[in-house]
Amino acid sequence: NYGAGGNGGGGGQGGTGGRGCSQCGSGNGGNGGAGGSGGTGGYGGGSVFFISPQINLGANSVISCNGSNGASGIAGTVGGNGQGAGGNGGTGGDGGNGAGGNGGFILLAYTNKTFTSGYSITVAGGAAGTLSGAGGNAGKTGVIKELSI
């Protein structure tokens, strides 16, 4: 549940080059553009265990097992120009966004605790990559577990 986010999907195939105009000779259509590469997924937040008879968290204490953000997919390239009367090649599909890493797991096991207001415990999921329209999911929120021992 807390591993790295998956890689973004591969870019779509470039569009077919346009046909040459029959009245103007048989110019070749341009090549389709290359598909963009998928973004790398974010890393999971990992795990932290605090097991002690007494746990103290001060006002500036920070415990963080957040997932990292996924990388953005790379946009597809534009196809080449046609030769002669040929049309231009289509633009390649965009690569998928990398998924955000899932938040991790934090365990606080104690007999007594002293938590001062202002501390921070977070297990947020990472954001997906931000290439427009290229999919990718945000990471899931992790788990914070308190246990009396």
Task: Give residue spans per PLM region.
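Glycine-centered low-complexity coil/loop motifs and glycine-rich tracts
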Residues: 1-49, 58-107, 116-149
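Alpha-helical support elements that line or immediately flank enzyme active sites
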Residues: 53-55, 113
